[in-house]
Amino acid sequence: MRDKIKLQSTESAYFYTTDKNKRNMAGKFEIKKYDPVLRKHVLFKEAKIK
């Protein structure tokens, strides 16, 4: 089952939305992605979509 998640930047208020397969990826998701607010790559962490 694929659930919608929010990837929140650790250094600004910018976020991406995506989905993840909870059966294959247990735990919180973390990835380095481009943050257009800061114009550099930063760590994004999984957060709940409200």
UniProtKB/Swiss-Prot annotation:
Pfam families assigned: Ribosomal_L33
InterPro entries: Ribosomal_bL33, Ribosomal_bL33_CS, Ribosomal_bL33_sf, Ribosomal_zn-bd
Family per similarity comment: Belongs to the bacterial ribosomal protein bL33 family.
UniProt name for this protein: Large ribosomal subunit protein bL33
Family matches, as PANTHER family: 54S RIBOSOMAL PROTEIN L39, MITOCHONDRIAL, LARGE RIBOSOMAL SUBUNIT PROTEIN BL33M
GO cellular component, one term: cytosolic large ribosomal subunit
Keyword Ribosomal protein: yes
Keyword Ribonucleoprotein: yes
GO biological process: translation
Highest rank taxon of the organism: Bacteria
Keywords, in A-Z order: Ribonucleoprotein, Ribosomal protein
An annotated Gene Ontology molecular function: structural constituent of ribosome
TM region positions: none
